[in-house]
């Protein structure tokens, strides 16, 4: 997996994408984690997916900031994600403790906009981040808790869709 925020995004992504090409392995990249409209890493990840011909090989983890953008921007990114056959992993409790900010942005929950991604036919899986670490010392990695956060924050109440998120899409995302 990658975390381009901590380094130069372009250099980091070039290394990851070249590695994926040389090994044939899928990429899982943590992007748009800060819940702000100035982040555009999901879009940049799509651009790198196209640049390297990695369609169907890339998963965006988090993409919380995508929800902070205007609907027209989100729809443009969703179209790019469809064309890139990109998938997403939502870690709903990872940013639930997001501190208040004075920034003006679209009102939204601090989670991956899974409801919109699903409406655009984009695969969404469930995950957990920061398990029993310095950031989330009481997080135990419960996928049921994460799924509950996802269904409540995105109002995804279709049981068949939730099963698909928890099982089928998860298997697809990790390549089994």
PLM region spans:
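His/Asp/Glu-enriched, well-ordered alpha-helical/loop segment
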Residues: 47-57, 94, 98, 109-176
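Histidine/acidic residue-rich metal-binding segments in metalloenzymes
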Residues: 1-59, 63-87, 104-126
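Short Asp/Glu-rich motifs
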Residues: 38-40, 100-101, 136-137
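Short, basic, glycine/proline-bearing loop/turn elements
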Residues: 62-64, 92-101
